[in-house]
């Protein structure tokens, strides 16, 4: 066999496995995201079995939840000539740094949890950082931000809102979309500001917000900062009646224990997956790991893995003796052509810049019970 692929090929000998790298956050305060996604990957590989007679070799790299982690993980993946594809990252900040490296190496990367609109925006003038080879089964936060803005205005009856982000591409983009939608509907934004990752003292920003008390505070930030904001706002004069709303960055089964009873009443926008396929996944999770997944993107991760493995199998050339030749551009072309993929999270069709999901698998939850996980679903009703 001869490689004619414009980006080159990965050769897999008959006695070698097909190698895939999973780049997720495996350490630190939000490692539950990585646990959630890697569980979905492992179950998908269990279900898939061999790929054209080859075992699947899954390599884990800790992309953390920052640019440095994403860059390091991507460099390791790109340096390994055996790698056929990449699954990840968890966080948009890690993906922003990883993407140029992965793209330059000719690899394809499918994320199950990146949601920042910038990652699939091709125009740098609009903040876009998209590079060829990037795909995601997670929603674009243009959908989640709209959901948050509409829910605040229509269901909560809010007419004023404030937002807090942490400077990350994810949080900054999401709060801005929410603010734009809320304003379009007729609402007024009283404050937009940021905390730093690592901050523990939130009273200064909360006191500033209280100078013009909003009906709702939207703060799509991660633990532990989201815990500190939720807890410390309770003692701020003027914010006693402000409704609190966070997002999928805070959607974790340990958020109640990490925050305390001040968490009660908090709204969360986050993925909402339903159906028989999803129930089967949960049963497999319980059998393999015990209990329930710790966050919300395990279904998306399962879908991303199945998409990648099916794509690899569809483009691989087999010499009849089990030796494979897998074209890198062929993988990209096949992923970009995906339409109507029947996944656990819905029907997926990939855009020219890698957005494969719609906003169908999104909902709003409210934490009303310190012992219940997942929280009560309030939208859709």
Task: Spell out what each predicted region is.
Residues 1-381:
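Extracytosolic ligand-binding ectodomains
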């Amino acid at each position: 066999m001869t490689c004619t692929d414009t980006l080159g090929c990965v050769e897999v000998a008959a006695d070698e496995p097909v190698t895939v790298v999973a780049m997720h956050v495996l350490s630190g305060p939000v490692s539950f995201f990585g646990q959630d996604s890697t569980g979905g990957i492992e179950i998908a590989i269990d279900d898939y079995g061999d790929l054209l007679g080859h075992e699947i070799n899954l390599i884990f790299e800790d992309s953390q939840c920052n640019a440095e982690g994403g860059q390091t993980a991507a460099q390791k993946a790109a340096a390994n000539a055996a790698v056929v594809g990449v699954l990840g990252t968890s966080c948009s900040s890690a993906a922003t740094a990883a993407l140029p490296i992965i793209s330059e190496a000719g690899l394809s990367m499918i994320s199950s949890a990146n949601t920042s609109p910038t990652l699939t925006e091709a125009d740098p003038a609009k903040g876009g950082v998209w590079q060829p080879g990037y795909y995601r089964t997670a929603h674009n936060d243009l959908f989640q931000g709209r959901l948050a803005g509409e829910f605040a205005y229509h269901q909560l009856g809010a007419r004023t809102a404030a937002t807090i982000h942490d400077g990350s591409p994810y949080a900054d983009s999401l709060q801005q979309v929410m603010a734009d939608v809320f304003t379009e509907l007729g609402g007024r934004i009283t404050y937009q500001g940021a905390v730093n990752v690592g901050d523990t003292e939130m009273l200064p920003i909360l006191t500033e917000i209280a100078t013009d008390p909003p009906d709702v505070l939207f703060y799509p930030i991660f633990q532990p900062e989201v815990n500190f904001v939720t807890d410390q706002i309770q003692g701020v004069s003027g914010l006693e009646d402000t409704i609190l709303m966070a997002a999928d960055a805070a959607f974790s089964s340990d958020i109640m224990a990490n925050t305390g009873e001040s968490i009660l009443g908090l709204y969360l926008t986050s993925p909402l997956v339903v159906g028989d396929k999803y129930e089967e996944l949960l049963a497999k999770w319980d059998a393999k790991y015990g209990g329930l997944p710790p966050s919300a993107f395990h279904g998306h991760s399962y879908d991303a893995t199945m998409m990648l493995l099916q794509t690899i199998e569809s483009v691989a050339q087999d010499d009849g003796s089990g030796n494979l030749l897998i074209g890198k551009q062929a993988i990209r072309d096949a992923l970009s052509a995906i339409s109507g993929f029947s996944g656990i999270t819905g029907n997926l069709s990939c855009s020219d810049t890698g957005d494969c999901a719609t906003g169908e698998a999104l909902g709003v939850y409210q934490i009303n019970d310190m012992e219940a996980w997942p929280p009560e679903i309030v939208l859709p009703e």
